[in-house]
């Protein structure tokens, strides 16, 4: 369930004025606690459940979980720090923030963490014990002060903060070393700052992170759930020396914020390594030469290269001497070099030797691996071994070996026969609903995957990531199918997927319920006992069942066939999606990028630019590709080709009848074809983005082309390469493209170099995968050379011109 649906649930189940009360809780969709001390109560809303937790007197309520369909609330003494979490359907877990926090605000009067040692390392005495010290403060004398176990507390408002009685007979009490919460101050470089400062150093108001005005940007809160990009508060999502924000001044894109450093010692760092693990952010070895053998510049020096990656700006990153480090979240340790001609370079650090590759343990660098050519699973999907890694709401799956953001026991070691590779959808616990995965969204523990049973996609086809499978029309009446999650489904199916008859929505037997009735939801189509989806459940239509021991279950409603003759952005041959570092890319699977065209001169037939089919009659390319001639008859377009020179009989060659240049001199142009292209498995348009859509930073996208390959294998055949999008704020740094990239452009590439678009790729597509299709986000435009380190390629941002594109096509 995505964030919008969670918000809708809150609105549905909260009473007026109760929303703010939940600010003190952390919510996790799909998580249930194993609790020993709990109460199970009837509750008609989240607000009811919240009130029961806040008013509990038999024990301290640290969490509650709400089951909407059961109208049930479970309030608990435990939380995820003290108890194990299991995945569960249709439940939201709410945990009180104060009991999850291990930091203090102010003097720590409200601290409720679990620190139980003093500054000098002495174990604390239990507050309820009378030996070795008879306490003045105890649970019985001060019941509201949280005097549990032997945890550090501040029941007397001591100005020096939390303390405890000690187990040392000679030391009655001592203070504890509790770090400050990063709300009024910051540790390190403010990566975990969660305060509410929303003005820059010069006093400018910050722009809200979920706004794209006045500055469009790629730090989209929904794409970076772990970065806490709330409201317009200063944050540090990209490894800067301190928190910053985009400003509301159109003439000032961004600026640092003035956040003071905390005066107490920072929290203890995690484990450090003398070898490479993950991205190497915790590498503390002494390698001091780059991959090409250049000596590293000392981090504290400013010659030959001036920079702000200094020990003062990054006090927690151990920037000692000239050792290779990764202070800012790069893909590997690096350093500035002592060569004035090479600003910086990655280092070669020996791997720690784990059998698990770094990429597998780091969900942030895992590629998107959801097939567009639809895979399916047999039965309940326990045997599914495909490469889908996206949930049914479009969330990215967490790697099975990773414990971030969700800790779990479904690991390859615990389930060796379950095929738990990378972050691919699997079914290790034999879930009857099919393959699932943990998500990379901290607020959504897990979801089912964006897959269908083979019986719903044509049936009987073996599961494979390679074999194309084209969905067939469902064998039911035209109206008895659903679009999306089936919220608008009004068919007459009245049995669950397991074959159990549905209970009528107006009935209260065998199951009594108050929320989902024809009276409470008059627009939800709750007629008779038909399957419906009144709460927008991502798993589709459901019903209360006639089985007294089964409250509800889901129905098996097929998806409706597409209304259009083709679907943009969906190739019929699965792309290779090679993650290699088209200089340095790999040869594409033939016809796996069916919108790619070759722009040629009509008479010589020589390829000189790429382009993208966006409708049967229109191609999008770069304006600079049309400098050879202003006459449309000079050009022709080749569609459905894989080889640049050897054109098969199924390749389409179509003349151009009109050239339309963008009126404000942007490097983008439309070509109208002399006749509509024939849509085949080899020729399919790409999808256009929504107007002004901004691709999130680090999104993995793909470029294709027949351009210059600099001697790498595959020349003459269509090549592909995977590139991460780089936020313009980063791309415009002095060491990269030095403010050359406009807001109407985007850049993408590997800063280490080695892979890029090149001459002959101009005008071609940069497409990004979104849930189930490829969207054309960029037109290959320019770069400083090909595949040079620190010089990513630049692409026209298509979303800024969608209104112009659609207007020209419509008015022609």
Swiss-Prot record:
SUPFAM superfamilies membership: Hairpin loop containing domain-like, Kringle-like, Trypsin-like serine proteases
Pfam family for this entry, one: Trypsin
InterPro entries cross-referenced by the UniProt entry: Kringle, Kringle-like, Kringle_CS, Kringle_sf, Pan_app, Pept_S1A_plasmin, Peptidase_S1_PA, Peptidase_S1_PA_chymotrypsin
GO terms of biological process kind: blood coagulation; extracellular matrix disassembly; fibrinolysis; labyrinthine layer blood vessel development; mononuclear cell migration; muscle cell cellular homeostasis; myoblast differentiation; negative regulation of cell-substrate adhesion
Main location: secreted
Span of the signal peptide: 1-19
Mechanisms controlling activity: Converted into plasmin by plasminogen activators, both plasminogen and its activator being bound to fibrin. Cannot be activated with streptokinase.
Compartment list: Secreted
GO-annotated molecular function: apolipoprotein binding; endopeptidase activity; enzyme binding; kinase binding; protease binding; protein antigen binding; protein domain specific binding; protein-folding chaperone binding
EC numbers on record: 3.4.21.7
Catalytic activity: Preferential cleavage: Lys-|-Xaa > Arg-|-Xaa, higher selectivity than trypsin. Converts fibrin into soluble products
Description of post-translational modifications: In the presence of the inhibitor, the activation involves only cleavage after Arg-581, yielding two chains held together by two disulfide bonds. In the absence of the inhibitor, the activation involves additionally the removal of the activation peptide.
GO cellular component, one term: external side of plasma membrane
Domain Kringle: 102-181, 184-262, 274-352, 375-454, 480-560
Domain notes: Kringle domains mediate interaction with CSPG4.
SUBUNIT field: Interacts (both mature PLG and the angiostatin peptide) with AMOT and CSPG4. Interacts (via the Kringle domains) with HRG; the interaction tethers PLG to the cell surface and enhances its activation. Interacts (via Kringle 4 domain) with ADA; the interaction stimulates PLG activation when in complex with DPP4. Angiostatin: Interacts with ATP5F1A; the interaction inhibits most of the angiogenic effects of angiostatin.
Anything else known: Plasmin is inactivated by alpha-2-antiplasmin immediately after dissociation from the clot. In the presence of the inhibitor, the activation involves only cleavage after Arg-581, resulting in 2 chains held together by 2 disulfide bonds. Without the inhibitor, the activation also involves removal of the activation peptide.
Protein name, UniProt field: Plasminogen
Natural source organism: Rattus norvegicus (Rat)
């Amino acid at each position: 369930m995505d964030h919008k649906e969670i918000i809708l649930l809150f609105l549905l189940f909260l009473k007026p004025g109760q929303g703010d009360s939940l600010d003190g809780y952390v919510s996790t969709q799909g998580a249930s606690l194993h609790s020993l001390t709990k109460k199970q109560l009837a509750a008609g809303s989240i607000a009811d459940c919240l009130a029961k937790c806040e008013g509990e007197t038999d024990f301290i309520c640290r969490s509650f979980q709400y089951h909407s369909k059961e109208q049930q609330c479970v309030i608990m003494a435990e939380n995820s720090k003290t108890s194990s979490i299991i995945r569960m359907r249709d439940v939201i877990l709410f945990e009180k923030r104060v009991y999850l926090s291990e930091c203090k605000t102010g003097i720590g009067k409200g601290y409720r963490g679990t620190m139980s040692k003093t500054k000098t390392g002495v174990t604390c005495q239990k507050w309820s014990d009378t030996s070795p010290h008879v306490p003045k403060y105890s649970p019985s004398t001060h019941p509201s002060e949280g005097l549990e176990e032997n945890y550090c507390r501040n029941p007397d408002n001591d100005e020096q903060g939390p303390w405890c009685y000690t187990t040392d007979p000679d030391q009655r009490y001592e203070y504890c070393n509790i770090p400050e919460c990063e709300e009024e101050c910051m540790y390190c470089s403010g990566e975990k700052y969660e305060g509410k400062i929303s003005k820059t150093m010069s006093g400018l108001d910050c722009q809200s992170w979920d706004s794209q005005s006045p500055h469009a940007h790629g730090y989209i809160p929904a794409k970076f759930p772990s970065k806490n990009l709330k409201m317009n508060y200063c944050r540090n999502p990209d490894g800067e020396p301190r928190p910053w924000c985009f400003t509301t001044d159109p003439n000032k894109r961004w600026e640092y914020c003035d956040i003071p450093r905390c005066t107490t010692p920072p929290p203890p760092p995690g484990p450090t390594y003398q070898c490479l693990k993950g991205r190497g952010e915790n590498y503390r070895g002494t390698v001091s030469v780059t991959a090409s053998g250049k000596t590293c510049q000392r981090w504290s020096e400013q010659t030959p290269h001036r920079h702000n990656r200094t020990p003062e700006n990054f006090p927690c990153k151990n920037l000692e001497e000239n050792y290779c480090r990764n202070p800012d979240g790069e893909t590997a340790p690096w350093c500035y070099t002592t060569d004035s001609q090479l600003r910086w370079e990655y280092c070669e650090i020996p791997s720690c030797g784990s059998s698990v590759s770094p990429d597998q343990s780091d969900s942030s660098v895992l590629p998107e691996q959801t097939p567009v050519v639809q895979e399916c699973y047999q039965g309940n999907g326990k045997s599914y071994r495909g490469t889908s890694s996206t949930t049914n709401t479009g969330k990215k799956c967490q790697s099975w070996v990773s414990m971030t953001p969700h800790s779990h026991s479904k690991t390859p070691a615990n389930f060796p026969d379950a095929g738990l590779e990378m972050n691919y959808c699997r079914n290790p616990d034999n879930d009857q609903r099919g393959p699932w995965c943990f998500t990379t969204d901290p607020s959504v523990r897990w979801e089912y995957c964006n897959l269908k049973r083979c019986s719903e996609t044509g049936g009987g086809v073996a599961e494979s990531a390679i074999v194309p499978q084209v969905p067939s029309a469902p064998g039911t009446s035209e109206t008895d199918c659903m679009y999306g999650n089936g919220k608008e489904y009004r068919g007459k199916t009245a049995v669950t997927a397991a074959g159990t008859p549905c209970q009528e929505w107006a009935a209260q037997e065998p199951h009594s319920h108050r929320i989902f009735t024809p009276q409470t939801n008059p627009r939800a189509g709750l007629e008779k006992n038909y399957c419906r989806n009144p709460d927008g459940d991502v798993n589709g239509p459901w019903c209360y069942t006639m089985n007294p021991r089964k409250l509800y279950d889901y129905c098996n409603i097929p998806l409706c066939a597409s209304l259009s003759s083709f679907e943009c952005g969906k190739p019929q041959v699965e792309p290779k999606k090679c993650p290699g570092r088209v200089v340095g890319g790999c040869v594409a699977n033939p016809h796996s990028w069916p919108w790619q065209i070759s722009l040629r001169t009509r008479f010589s037939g020589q390829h000189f630019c790429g382009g993208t089919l966006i409708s049967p009659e229109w191609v999008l390319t770069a304006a600079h590709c049309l400098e050879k001639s202003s006459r449309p008859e000079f050009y022709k377009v080749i569609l459905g080709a894989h080889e640049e020179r050897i054109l098969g009989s199924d390749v389409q060659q179509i003349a151009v009848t009109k050239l339309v240049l963008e009126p404000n001199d942007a490097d983008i142009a439309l070509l109208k074809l002399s006749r509509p292209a024939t849509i085949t498995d080899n020729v399919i348009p790409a999808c256009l983005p929504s107007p002004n859509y901004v691709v999130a930073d680090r999104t993995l996208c793909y470029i294709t082309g027949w351009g210059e390959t600099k001697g790498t294998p595959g020349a003459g055949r269509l090549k592909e390469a995977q590139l991460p999008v780089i936020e313009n704020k980063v791309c415009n740094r002095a060491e990269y493209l030095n403010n050359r990239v406009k807001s109407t452009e985007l850049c993408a590439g590997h800063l280490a170099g080695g892979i890029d678009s090149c001459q002959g790729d101009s005008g071609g597509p940069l497409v990004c995968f979104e849930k189930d299709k490829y969207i054309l986000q960029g037109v290959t435009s320019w770069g400083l050379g090909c595949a040079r380190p620190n010089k990513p390629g630049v692409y026209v941002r298509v979303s800024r011109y969608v209104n112009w594109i659609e207007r020209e096509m419509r008015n022609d």
